[in-house]
Amino acid sequence: MIVTTTPNIEGKRIVRYCGVIAGEAILGANIFKDLSAGIRDIVGGRSGTYERELEKARAIALEELQQHAVALGANAVVGIDLDYETFGKANGMLMVSVSGTAVVVE
């Protein structure tokens, strides 16, 4: 399945719009506790542990998005937008959300 941030796909023609779809993943507070305990992971101002968890959450959100697209009969998703939001007590939760338009391309 093609998933892209662009509104169209070069060399492909959109023949049907199936609808707006979304996928989400939420990281619980325990990841932030683990991160503060694992400060030694930080190299050059970056935390490898945190980045790996974000990558996992992003992959989960994108997989959920694609599952919704397939359920609508789409073979591509265009115009995707990834967002990251913190919430909860002391911003202890992180949500990764992705949305886009499910389409059929030829």
From Swiss-Prot:
InterPro entries from the UniProt entry: UPF0145_dom_sf, UPF0145_YbjQ-like
SUPFAM superfamilies for this protein: YbjQ-like
Coiled coil: none
Organism domain of life: Bacteria
HAMAP family per the UniProt record, alphabetical: UPF0145 (MF_00338)
Family according to the record: Belongs to the UPF0145 family.
Annotated protein name in UniProt: UPF0145 protein VC_A0951
Organism: Vibrio cholerae serotype O1 (strain ATCC 39315 / El Tor Inaba N16961)
